[in-house]
Amino acid sequence: SDYASQTIEGFLGSIYLHNRSAKLKDLADTLTYYEPLAPAESFWVSNTYRKGELKVLDTEQKDYKVFLGGTHGPYRVLDGGYHTGRNMLMVCDSFGNAIAPFLMPYYDSVYMVDFRDEYYSKEAAQGGVAEYIRRCGIQDIYVVLSESEGVGTAFINQLMPANLK
């Protein structure tokens, strides 16, 4: 592999953060994460305006927030300087945070949106997603969801249709 990797021992994940079960703590795992192939930048975005820089890999974190420092909304953009002439949007929950850096070599910009209420509102986004796609010149859209946000959930049945307009 061309990717350099690092590991975090004692990784507990999101489920542990929600219930702090001692049984889960006994099942701690090793998390392997991969560094981007080229230097990358990440920004919190409202509409098309970059509001603040965020880390692509937050190696000071010892949990799932190592990936992009966690979820930020209403939008996030990753730039890797690959000059492909293409942009993409990933509609995702937090699982997209681990996957987005792998898509950077194929796009100028990787945009991300998480429609869960704590991260997204049309007011904070200053408009709808369809307009955002047009303004950012996005050609491809990926949907990356964990099982808990997948088929048959409110994310798919309500949040996505309501916010993609």
Give the location of each predicted region.
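Extracellular glycan-modifying ectodomains
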Residues: 1-165
